[in-house]
Amino acid sequence: MKPLQTNFNLLTYLYERKEIVEDTLNKSIPRGNPTFIYDSIRYSLSAGGKRIRPILCLASCELAGGTMEMALPTACALEMIHTMSLIHDDLPAMDNDSYRRGKPTNHIIYGEDLAILAGDALLAYAFEFIATQTKNVPADLIVKVIAQVAHSVTTSGLVGGQIIDLSSEGKSDTTLETLNFIHIHKTGALLEAAVLSGALLAGAKEKDMNRFLRYAQNIGLAFQIIDDVLDIISTEEKLGKSIGKDLKTQKATYPSFWGVEESIKQAELLVEEAKEEILYFDNKAIPLIAIADFIVNRNN
């Protein structure tokens, strides 16, 4: 295999796509009445963040032969769903967090009732946005994408992971197998949906979809391992959210099983496996390869 190009600038790539995603998100939900629910929705949706899920969706679509325009509605929908999950995650009945993306959490500003409804609305808006805004993609592929994204939120995805996460809190007998289950579903499912939906929109073949799947599964788990590490070694200012909470609530984490250094090694191994899956695409894979490296080397 010929060597991959080395002049790719990941920071520029991430910045440009983040700007496109945020511009589209800002226009995606126009203000209406009652205004305060829109204020609550937009407070969290415009709070920043890495926008890694939408960027993965755009990158996989382009790698599979599609265009950014084809994938942009789904990319933004994924960010709406991710934002919904953060709003609901932060509620007192869930993780009870008061600080997210460098700001007070949604329910601290708008109350628990509006926070719940804002999350509900974002979930519905996400699927409406895919269905009404996706252009130049066959209808059968749009249906497949909607099914893929929806599945990532069900009890086989994000919800299932959150349920086991909540029920494991404070227990000293949580196994590594259970921890993997939690994060394959709670964190990994939406990252997986981002990669797969982008490829689906471009009409990727089944053998290529399997490569995208294995790439996504590996980076999803690596992402969570590094999140657990950062909760120990980073600062609240860098992360933009509360730190040390896992330790306080006696929640099982990868460092609690392996320690910090071994956790980082395991994440690096997963990223190498992810990259191996898409080297098949040669230079077209460079953005996804660089994003995989970013996931394990990030500091927030």
Swiss-Prot record:
GO MF entries: geranylgeranyl diphosphate synthase activity; metal ion binding
Cofactor or coenzyme needed: Mg(2+)
Positions contributing to (2E,6E)-farnesyl diphosphate binding: 100, 186-187, 224
Pathway in which this enzyme or protein is active: Isoprenoid biosynthesis; geranylgeranyl diphosphate biosynthesis; geranylgeranyl diphosphate from farnesyl diphosphate and isopentenyl diphosphate: step 1/1
Cell compartment(s), UniProt: Plastid, Cyanelle
Reactions that this protein is recorded to catalyse: isopentenyl diphosphate + (2E,6E)-farnesyl diphosphate = (2E,6E,10E)-geranylgeranyl diphosphate + diphosphate
Family classification: Belongs to the FPP/GGPP synthase family.
Protein name: Geranylgeranyl diphosphate synthase
Organism: Cyanophora paradoxa
